[in-house]
Amino acid sequence: MRRIAFLLALAGLALGPAGCGDRNMVLTVNLLSFIAPADRSGGYGPIPAGLVGTSVDLIDQDVTLLPGLSSVVDVESATLRIGMRFENQTGSASGHVLVYLAPSDSTSAFGVPPLADIPVTLAPNDTVQVATEIASSPALSAALTQEHARLGVRVSFDTTGSLSVLQGSETTEELLGIVVTKRSL
């Protein structure tokens, strides 16, 4: 019995400092919560077969992120989780889901380079789930620690291999920013 108590105490001492987090703070920003439920889904098409680079803007909206954060903390890492569902009805296409976070004074979210470029392939009468996590980068860290930003999601379709018109619907299911910070000294 004493041996078990000793092992439990030893495990507690070993794991205690690990839970402290070295004064890190993890902040989660549900970007999807800024988008009205009716605006999280939309249709695309009809897009004729044989076209390259047909873009459909799904989201272009102002969001409030983490007010005052950048002046009191240093960002250790930032990630962005993205989840979408495409319910394609007709036609086929390859494409790219592009995610943008522009400064809030921008007239459009699409005036800056995308933070994410996710490939997607659509076939007739098929449902495709797209899910990815964008790793930390200076651009992502800067974007997620602004007070306000303009969020954009665009899909670019290439229907050159399709024999029929591309048409279907898209639902954005997850846009989650995770920022790990450390207090500035």
Predicted stretch roles:
Residues 28-51:
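Post-signal peptide N-terminal segment of mature Sec-exported envelope proteins
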Residues 15-35:
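Bacterial Sec signal peptide processing site at the extreme N-terminus
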Residues 90-111:
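Short, surface-exposed beta-strand/strand-loop-strand elements in extracellular ectodomains
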Residues 1-20:
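Sec-dependent bacterial lipoprotein signal peptides
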Residues 120-170:
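Cysteine-clustered segments with highest specificity for TGF-beta superfamily mature ligands
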Residues 172-185:
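Short, low-complexity, Pro/Ser/Thr/Gly-rich segments in the mature regions of secreted, periplasmic
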Residues 73-91:
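A short beta-strand element within beta-rich, extracytoplasmic domains
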Residues 49-72:
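Short beta-strands within extracellular/lumenal beta-sheet-rich domains
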